C-alpha cells in the first residue's frame, strides 16, 4: 500500500509544481499561495454550483476569474474548471444547462505513467460565444470555441471547435444541422 501512496504523493507534487510554474509562483510561499488560491476557488465554485439563483452563481464564478458577459443564465450544477477558471470566457446571452461541464485543462492526476510524457497536460482557453446554448450534461473540453448562436445538444462531448449557427450532438460532438 505504501508504493501506491508514494505514487499519489509524487503525482500531487508534480501537479502542484506545474500549477506554481503556470502562475509564476516559487518556493514555500508559492506553494502556500497556490493552496489558498485553490481553496478560495473551490469555496466560490461550491457556492455557485448548487445555487438556484443564476445571478448569484454568475457573481461567484466571476469572483473566481471566469470572464462572463451580459444576460447569461446558469442553471444549478453547471461546472466550470476548478484549477484554471480564468481561462474560461463566456460571452453575452449564453445559457449553461444543469450538469454541463467546461474544462480548461486535461490532466491525469494520479497516474505517473500517463503523466510522464505519454499523456501530456493540456491547458487552453475555452470560449463560449454569444447566444450559445450548452444543454444539460454536455462537456466542453480544453481549447474549444463554441460559435455564436450554436446549440450543444444534451450529453454531447465537444472536443473540437463548433462553427457559428450550428447544432452539435454526440460523443464526440459533430455538426448535425446549420441554424439559419
Model-derived segments and spans:
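Conserved short histidine dyad/triad with adjacent acidic residue
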Residues: 51, 73-74
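A generic "structured core" feature
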Residues: 151-153, 157
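Active-site nucleotide-sugar/metal-binding loop of Leloir-type enzymes
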Residues: 160
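Acidic, glycine-centered active-site loop in nucleotide-sugar glycosyltransferases
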Residues: 164, 169-172
Amino acid at each position: 500500500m505504501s508504493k501506491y501512496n508514494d505514487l499519489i504523493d509524487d503525482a500531487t507534487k508534480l501537479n502542484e509544481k506545474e500549477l506554481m510554474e503556470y502562475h509564476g509562483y516559487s518556493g514555500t510561499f508559492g506553494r502556500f499561495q497556490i493552496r489558498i488560491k485553490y481553496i478560495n476557488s473551490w469555496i466560490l465554485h461550491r457556492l455557485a454550483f448548487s445555487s438556484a439563483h443564476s445571478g448569484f452563481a454568475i457573481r461567484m464564478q466571476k469572483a473566481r476569474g471566469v470572464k462572463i458577459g451580459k444576460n447569461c443564465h446558469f442553471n444549478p450544477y453547471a461546472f466550470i474548471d476548478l484549477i484554471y477558471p480564468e481561462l474560461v470566457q463566456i460571452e453575452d446571452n449564453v445559457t449553461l444547462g444543469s450538469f454541463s461541464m467546461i474544462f480548461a485543462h486535461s490532466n491525469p492526476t494520479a497516474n505517473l505513467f500517463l503523466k510522464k510524457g505519454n499523456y501530456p497536460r493540456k491547458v487552453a482557453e475555452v470560449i463560449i460565444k454569444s447566444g450559445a446554448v450548452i444543454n444539460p450534461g454536455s462537456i466542453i473540453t480544453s481549447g474549444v470555441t463554441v460559435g455564436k448562436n450554436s446549440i450543444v445538444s444534451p450529453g454531447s462531448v465537444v472536443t473540437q471547435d463548433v462553427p457559428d449557427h450550428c447544432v452539435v450532438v454526440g460523443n464526440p460532438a459533430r455538426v448535425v444541422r446549420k441554424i439559419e
